[in-house]
Amino acid sequence: PRMAAQECDCDFNTSGDTVFYNEYLEFYEQTYMKEPLEKRGVDKNLWVWESADYSRLYMVVADVARGDGKYYSAFHVIDIESNTQVAEYKGQIGTKEFGHLLVGIANEYNEALLVVENANIGWSTIQTILDRGYQNMYYSPKSDALNAESYFDKYQDKSKMVPGFTMSTRTRPMVIGKFAEYVSD
């Protein structure tokens, strides 16, 4: 049942079930969560635990929402070398404004690799990022090939790639499975 909502592309919050057991979530909350060093922005929804260290590599991973209603756009800044979350944002913001915010935070964190979900309204945010000329953006393969060789072959030729990360019924189980494997170790 825990994977059913995820595999059917359902909303975890409304399905009443999650991928991770509540005990695991509570353990991580009690063990690892700490107050941010800084809360930034008009809405104070940008939480920073570590400022950029210019000797480190970072990744900014973003999920785009419309900017109104009950859904929120969010991003996480990850130190790639230590696998540590150093900042996060969750807020109701327009898709274009979110693109500008992402470019700003990615530049602040050493021109971080910017990974934005490209489904539906994510395109508006991605277009803003591309219009700003941000260079270090993740591209997904256009095909459904699952092996690393096909990915790296295509990575050399952006005409075979699409900007952003494509979350789909094929990639979602892989992403969640890999994350579950990571946090359980």
Description of each model-found segment:
Residues 156-158:
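Luminal/periplasmic acceptor-recognition loop/helix of membrane-associated glycosyltransferases
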Residues 1-152, 161, 169, 173-177, ...:
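RNase H-like, metal-dependent nuclease domains and their acidic two-metal-ion catalytic environment used
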Residues 164:
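Extracytoplasmic catalytic/substrate-binding loops of multi-pass membrane glycan-assembly enzymes
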